[in-house]
Regions:
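Active-site beta-loop-alpha junctions of metal-dependent nucleic acid enzymes
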Residues: 50-51, 67-95
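Acidic/histidine-rich, metal-coordinating catalytic segments
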Residues: 89-112, 135-137, 142
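Basic, flexible linker segments flanking DNA-binding modules
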Residues: 1-41, 102, 109, 115-121
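Charged alpha-helix within mobile-element recombinases
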Residues: 113, 119-181
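Mobile genetic element proteins and their domesticated derivatives, centered on retroelements
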Residues: 1, 34, 57, 63, ...
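An active-site-proximal beta-strand-loop segment
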Residues: 33-65
Length: 181
């Protein structure tokens, strides 16, 4: 039918055209934050069977990076990470960009119906830092921190084993200081 012109021809889907990237003008203007699971293949000894989490923050202007390991993946850990980040970052922080994970926001949970904020969001508000949430299921919007997680897998987690949480924390701190900044 299409060949003889009776059925309408469906036009092809339009090609995806990315929006222009908003360049940051100074350090602290926007910082990307994300959480990564430490691969279980890296855990041996008393750490075997446990879960550890790597919180990462990258300044979009200077690419300055701060990493910290946590035993818990929660809004409390996110708040503690934020406090440590604010102390470690040499400039004032204007905006923090995160995904929509429950460790950062209640945006997509039933609890979001009441205007209750997570500990992380309360601390941001208290510190006067704007919270920008990326579009759901679009990790490329947090591309710098996602890329750093991939590089961590290739350079660090592929070659290291951890016997305890303290061992993981120390090695991660040493790796970040030596290899990234």
């Amino acid at each position: 039918m299409k060949r003889i012109g009776v059925a309408p021809v469906k036009p092809p889907n339009p090609k995806y055209v990315p929006k222009p990237y908003e360049q940051m003008l100074y350090p602290g203007q926007r910082i990307q934050i994300d959480v990564k699971f430490v691969p279980s293949a890296c855990l041996t000894g008393e750490a075997k069977g446990k879960r550890f989490y790597q919180y990462t923050a990258i300044d979009e202007f200077s690419r300055w990076r701060y990493v910290e390991a946590f035993e818990e993946h929660s809004t409390y850990s996110s708040m503690i990470f934020l406090l440590h980040l604010v102390q470690a970052f040499p400039m004032p922080i204007e905006c923090v960009q995160t995904d929509n994970g429950t460790e950062f926001t209640k945006r997509f949970t039933k609890a979001s119906l009441d205007e209750d904020l997570t500990l992380f969001e309360r601390k941001l508000k208290e510190l006067g830092i704007k919270h920008k949430k990326i579009r759901p299921f679009t990790p490329r919007h947090n591309g710098k921190v996602e890329r750093s997680h991939r590089k961590d897998n290739e350079r660090f987690y592929a070659t290291h084993c951890f016997f305890s949480f303290e061992d993981c924390r120390i090695q991660l701190k040493r790796y970040n200081y030596r290899d990234y900044n």
